[in-house]
From Swiss-Prot:
Location in the cell: Mitochondrion
Subunit-level organization: Component of the mitochondrial ribosome large subunit (39S) which comprises a 16S rRNA and about 50 distinct proteins.
Cross-referenced PANTHER family: LARGE RIBOSOMAL SUBUNIT PROTEIN UL30M, MITOCHONDRIAL RIBOSOMAL PROTEIN L30
Designated gene of the protein: Mrpl30
Gene3D superfamilies: Ribosomal protein L30, ferredoxin-like fold domain
GO biological process: mitochondrial translation
Annotated GO MF terms: structural constituent of ribosome
Keyword terms: Mitochondrion, Ribonucleoprotein, Ribosomal protein, Transit peptide
Protein family: Belongs to the universal ribosomal protein uL30 family.
Classification via CDD domains: Ribosomal_L30
Region span, Disordered: 44-64
Name this protein carries in UniProt: Large ribosomal subunit protein uL30m
Organism expressing this protein natively: Mus musculus (Mouse)
SUPFAM superfamilies for this protein: Ribosomal protein L30p/L7e (SSF55129)
Length: 160
């Protein structure tokens, strides 16, 4: 049926040329950027600023040795690699802090899930605790590890 109609009513050739001209103008690539040679982000954005260190409490010459990492967002509807990283870091339970070393391999894993976690430096105002005092330490929400001193009772001397 379509063949009969085409033979009965041929299209004028001028109309086809108009469509071609319109198609060429749409296909034209002068509005597309072909080369990505220059970065759109200025280099000064990536340079460290002293205000950042004051704001976040870091010292670039003496970085902290340990991180306190807390998961603050859910892993539901997140990709499997983020869930695997959260499990690897031991952050399955939300709002329970974990302590990790400040080394490049751990920092690379933290960078993958940085939008799901909070990272704080571990502050040791009383120094690193020993094995005996490890059981009597308390981790504050500010990131300080405080050793709770237990008072030993004074032995009463027997009255003579």
């Amino acid at each position: 049926m379509a063949g009969v109609l085409r033979s009965a009513f041929p299209r004028p050739p001028c109309r086809l040329q108009t469509v071609k001209k319109g198609a060429e103008s749409l296909i034209g690539t002068e509005w597309i950027r072909h080369k990505f040679t220059k970065s759109r982000i200025p280099d000064k954005v990536f340079q460290p600023k002293p205000e950042d260190h004051e704001k976040y409490g870091g010292d670039p010459q003496n970085p902290h040795k340990l991180h306190i990492v807390t998961r603050i967002r859910s892993t539901k509807r997140r990709p499997y690699w983020e869930k695997d990283t959260i499990k690897m870091l031991g952050l399955q339970k939300a709002h329970s802090p974990q302590i990790h070393k400040n080394i490049p391999s751990v920092n690379a894993k933290l960078k993958v899930v940085k939008h799901l976690i909070r990272i704080q430096p571990l502050k040791l105002p009383q120094g690193l605790p020993t094995e005996e005092t490890m059981s009597s330490t308390c981790l504050k929400s500010t990131g300080e590890l405080v050793v709770q001193w237990h008072l030993k009772p004074v032995e009463q001397e027997a009255k003579s």
